[in-house]
A protein has these predicted regions:
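Periplasmic/extracellular loop-to-transmembrane helix junction in inner-membrane transport proteins
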Residues: 17-19, 47-94
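Alpha-helical membrane-protein architecture signal
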Residues: 62, 75, 79, 83, ...
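C-terminal transmembrane helix and the adjacent membrane-cytosol boundary/short C-terminal tail
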Residues: 111, 168, 203, 246-277
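Transmembrane-helix boundary motif in ABC transporter permease subunits
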Residues: 91-121
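Generic hydrophobic transmembrane alpha-helix motif, especially the helices
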Residues: 122-158, 165-166
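Short cytoplasmic-facing helical segments at TM-TM junctions of multi-pass membrane proteins
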Residues: 162-207, 228
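Transmembrane alpha-helices
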Residues: 149, 153, 185-219, 242, ...
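Transmembrane alpha-helical segments of polytopic membrane transport and secretion proteins
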Residues: 1-35, 260-277
């Protein structure tokens, strides 16, 4: 069997125009919401309704941000803190995708693999990362391995479960058609199962990435000397609220940018997903 291709999806011009208009409308609503939140933040701090110790004004956060970029905080600049966190998130996400997708395919496609692996994933998935953080430190020490491993475990479960769900929902007619043409098991996985499960896999990656960012602060509690989570925790101990707010905003912006990138990738790779037929 040489190749299997997914049929092209025909999109009507009228529906494309409507989709673009709806997208622009949604973006304007999102932008106005963001502007409104910043205005409320500024108004609350300008009228001294909340003391700067608890909520610094936007101008103070921006000034502190420039100071962190130029001189740094806790012996590292903002870029160094950001680079350390991104490397940990990137390694955790990369290893999770490389291992969770094959595991999810095995769970969704093989009864024995499902019986062995599914209970293990469901057993540890609800446990908060902070609960098994001490055990990881005992096993792996306080180096980078323990930080990346904690993030990896947090991201692994959502991707594996989403992949298994996508595999189980593959149209049996597609599998039978490919088998009738002489497809091997490897060809079925590559040309039928993976393309059909791709929307669920990408959704799992998006969910896992969000969980990974929320685990980052816990991971950087392990004897870290740099990283956004470390920066926020250190600033909180000394009540440096503007650094805390800045760190939270940077994490939110980076996570949001990654989420938008994954959404764009999902629209590019699986344009038919979510369309009304």
């Amino acid at each position: 069997m040489s190749s299997y291709e997914i049929p092209a999806v025909t999109v009507k011009p009228g529906s494309t125009v409507i989709a673009v208009r709806r997208s622009l409308s949604t973006r304007w609503i999102s932008l106005l919401t963001l502007v409104a939140l910043v205005v409320i933040w500024w108004a609350v701090t300008a009228t001294a309704m909340i003391e700067p110790l608890f909520l610094p004004p936007p101008s103070a956060v921006l000034q502190k941000g420039w100071l962190l970029v130029t001189t740094g905080y806790m012996d590292s600049t903002l870029w160094q803190h950001l680079g350390a966190s991104l490397s940990r998130i990137g390694l955790g996400l990369g290893f999770a995708v490389l291992t969770a997708v094959p595991v999810g395919i095995a769970i969704g496609d093989n009864r024995i693999a499902r019986g062995i692996l599914d209970p293990l994933i469901e057993f540890y998935r609800p446990i908060p990362p902070l609960a098994y953080l001490p055990l990881i430190v005992i096993w792996c020490g306080i180096g980078e391995l323990s930080k990346v491993l904690l993030i990896y475990l947090a991201i692994f479960a959502p991707i594996a479960i989403a992949t298994a769900t996508g595999v189980r929902t593959v149209d049996p007619a597609k599998l039978r058609a490919a088998q009738s043409l002489g497809a091997t098991k490897a060809q079925l996985i590559r040309h039928v199962i993976l393309p059909s499960a791709l929307p669920d896999i990408l959704t799992g990656v998006r969910i896992g990435l969000g969980v990974g960012w929320s685990t980052l602060v816990a991971a950087e509690l392990i004897a870290a000397t740099s990283g956004l989570g470390f920066m926020v925790q250190s600033a909180a101990q000394f009540l440096v609220t503007d650094v805390v707010v800045l760190g939270i905003l940077v994490i939110a912006l980076i996570a949001f940018a990654m989420e938008m990138g994954l959404r764009a990738l999902q629209r590019k790779l699986v344009p038919w997903h979510g369309q009304a037929h």
